[in-house]
């Protein structure tokens, strides 16, 4: 049986991502559910879309292709992002993070768009 914090975090995780939290989590996942999703993810003030846009901005500035694809895909799947967001976000990123990093964001968004066409 998982802690109440884990259960609250897992419930929030499942609102944010199109998959279920593990019933038998390793230590890293347990900590993520209990802290990131339970403590921070359930705070009032920012919507799931707001949080996703912040994450996208941060990981775009880092050039983190894997998390960009994860967040773009989850945003589409969970209804937080539209297909036009996949075009506009990399364009906007180009002005704040620079063109080379916006190319990484655009490539990740394009990969997710390709999946929508199939």
Task: For every predicted segment, state its role.
Residues 1-49, 69-72, 77, 101-118:
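Acidic, glycine/proline-rich low-complexity segments that act as flexible tails and inter-domain linkers
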Residues 37, 59, 91-98:
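Amphipathic alpha-helical core segments of compact helical bundles
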Residues 51-59, 89:
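Short, structured motif recognition centered on aromatic/hydrophobic residues
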Residues 62-66, 98-101:
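Short helix-coil transition sites and intra-membrane helix breaks within transmembrane domains
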Residues 64-87:
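Mid-chain, well-packed structural core segment of small domains
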Residues 87, 94-107:
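C-terminal structural segments of small proteins and small subunits
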């Amino acid at each position: 049986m998982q802690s109440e914090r884990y259960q609250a975090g897992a419930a929030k995780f499942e609102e944010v991502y199109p998959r279920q939290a593990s019933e038998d989590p390793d230590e890293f996942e347990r900590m993520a559910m209990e802290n990131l999703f339970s403590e921070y993810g359930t705070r009032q003030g920012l919507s799931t879309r707001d949080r996703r846009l912040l994450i996208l901005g941060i990981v775009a500035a880092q050039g983190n292709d894997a998390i960009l694809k994860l967040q773009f895909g989850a945003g589409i799947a969970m209804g937080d992002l539209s297909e036009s967001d996949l075009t506009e976000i990399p364009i906007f990123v180009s002005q704040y993070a620079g063109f080379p990093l916006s190319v990484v964001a655009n490539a990740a968004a394009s990969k997710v768009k390709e999946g929508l066409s199939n």
